Amino acid sequence: MATTLTERFRFISPVQTETPFHVTGFTGVEGLHRLFDFHIDLVCADAAVDTGKLLAAPCRFEILRDGDAAPAVFSGYPARVEQRGFFNGYAYYSVHLRPTLWKLTQLRQSAVFLNKKLEDVLRELINSQTFFQFPHEFRLTAGDYPAPEFAMQYQETLYDY
């Protein structure tokens, strides 16, 4: 009697297209007002995955659901990648996946803003991050935001500020 396995989880990276990754396990947390945090164990027939390129590439983790329901999708960047071993022609990897916004938690800085509108302050802060660029859309709800005389960011991350 043959058994067919149905894939329930997917890890997708533009780096690995010829021989895909297969999820063997994961742990993680996600919730309202919280950045998700997934540790994903993978297996791949390619033992020569360029982990440097994998770290720099946007990845997606999907939890597939029954029927025609859309999968739960978590997109972000690997914060850490390890090759854990090699056995019987397969390489085992561990990936720590964080959302793109997580990168904004990695740098503390200080800045002073004089007579600048909120929109201008936000644009300046986000555009100042040259060591990591990420696609974003800048939208504020209707209304006029005043330009405070003085605003300061002191030893805060961009995410916290």
Predicted regions and their residues:
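Amphipathic alpha-helical and helix-coil boundary elements used as assembly
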Residues: 1-161
